[in-house]
Each structure stands twice: as C-alpha cells, then as structure tokens.
C-alpha cells in the first residue's frame, strides 16, 4: 500500500515523547534526511539538487525543536509552526494557523499537509500533543491523549490511527517509521527522521 508521507507522534514504548517522519515517494526518491542540533531536514541527494527546480515541495525541515517542544510536518509549515510557537502562540492555534494559511499543496495530487507538535514532559497534567491535517476538503486539528502514539499520512485515511511505537532512541525511531511494525506495510520508503526526548531532545535519521 502506498500512503505517501507519514508522521508519527506521541509517547513511545517507554513513555517518552517523540516525533517521527518518513518520506515515501514515487516521483522524487533521490532524497535524504540530514540531522542537526535542533532540526532534521529533507534534501536532495548529491547529484540530484536540480530536482528542487521541478518541485519546490521536496525540500524542507521536517522536524524542529523549539522551547520544550518538537514539531514535525511534511513541508515548509514546520517552520511556520515553530515560529508561531516561539512567539508564544499555543500549539493548537499554531498548527491550525499554518494549515489554514498554507493549505494543501498545489500539486497534481492536491497533497495534504500534515503536522504535529508534542511537549517534552511526561507529566500528565503538563503534557500536550496535537496532530493536524489540511486537504482539499477539510482542516482538522486533534488532541492526542496522554500515553498514546498515533500516525497520519498524506494519502491514507486522512485521519490519525493509533500505533504501538516500539523504538527507544531517535535513530531507532527513524528506522522504525521507515520499515518497522505497521510501517513495513507501506511502500516506496525513501528516508526518515525522528526526535525522542530523554532528558533532552535527541534527533536521529535513517538513510538506506
């Protein structure tokens, strides 16, 4: 089954907040995920830089760390959400603002924009996690309950699904969303990135 780009968010098997992201692509498979101190980025592989002139949607920050929060998305709205949170906007409104403003991608497939934000704390009263999607018919932002993990994809059910996210470290999380568990059922995996909070946010990646 091909579901396009996938993100997962919530708490992992150890009760640690995490985000994970996978590129699945039929048209532009020559991409990689690069990790930095406070972000992970999707970029063309060396020799395929010209691809950005064919499709401006293929390179972006897929993960950003701002304050105590991790932001994950399938496009440039990662930065919009991060900027709004840095300015003091709450998580729900930051996701809704970015999805409403940028809307679905204006490509041949009307690719939906998906996004999520999770706080670093594992204290129930302080924990916050939201996931959202904007397609050509709707915009949804949903709160994810404490202790749960979910995933959502661009061409899947258009609503989040629960998942047992059995990965402990950031690198393990990137590998898990690439081809572990239920994600092994989804085709055309290209690259993946993730962040897991273990006293601090750690960013990982997987490039096959």
From Swiss-Prot:
Pathway: Purine metabolism; IMP biosynthesis via de novo pathway; IMP from 5-formamido-1-(5-phospho-D-ribosyl)imidazole-4-carboxamide: step 1/1. It catalyses: IMP + H2O = 5-formamido-1-(5-phospho-D-ribosyl)imidazole-4-carboxamide. InterPro entries: IMP_cyclohydrolase, IMP_cyclohydrolase-like, IMP_cyclohydrolase-like_sf. GO terms for molecular function: IMP cyclohydrolase activity. It holds the Pfam family IMP_cyclohyd. It comes from the Archaea. Its EC number is 3.5.4.10. GO terms for biological process: 'de novo' IMP biosynthetic process. Keywords: Hydrolase, Purine biosynthesis. Catalyzes the cyclization of 5-formylamidoimidazole-4-carboxamide ribonucleotide to IMP. Belongs to the archaeal IMP cyclohydrolase family. NCBIfam families: PRK04151.1, purO_arch. This is IMP cyclohydrolase. It comes from Methanobrevibacter smithii (strain ATCC 35061 / DSM 861 / OCM 144 / PS).
């Amino acid at each position: 089954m091909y579901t396009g780009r996938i993100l997962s968010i919530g708490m992992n098997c150890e009760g640690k907040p995490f985000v994970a992201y996978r590129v699945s692509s039929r048209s532009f498979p020559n991409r990689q995920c690069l990790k930095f101190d406070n972000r992970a980025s999707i970029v063309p592989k060396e020799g395929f830089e010209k691809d950005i002139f064919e499709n401006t949607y293929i390179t972006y920050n897929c993960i950003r760390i701002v304050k105590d929060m991790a932001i994950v998305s399938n496009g440039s709205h990662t930065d919009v959400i991060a900027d709004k949170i840095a300015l003091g906007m709450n998580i729900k409104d930051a996701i809704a603002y970015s999805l409403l403003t940028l809307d679905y991608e204006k490509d041949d497939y009307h690719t939906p924009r998906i996004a999520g934000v999770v706080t670093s704390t594992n204290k129930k009263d302080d924990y916050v996690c939201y996931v959202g999607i904007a397609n050509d018919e709707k915009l949804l932002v949903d709160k994810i309950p404490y202790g749960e993990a979910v995933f959502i994809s661009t061409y899947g059910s258009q609503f989040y699904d629960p998942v047992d996210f059995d990965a402990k470290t950031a690198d393990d999380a990137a590998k898990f969303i690439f081809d572990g568990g239920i994600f092994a059922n989804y085709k055309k995996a290209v690259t993946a990135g993730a962040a897991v909070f273990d006293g601090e946010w750690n960013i990982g990646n997987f490039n096959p």
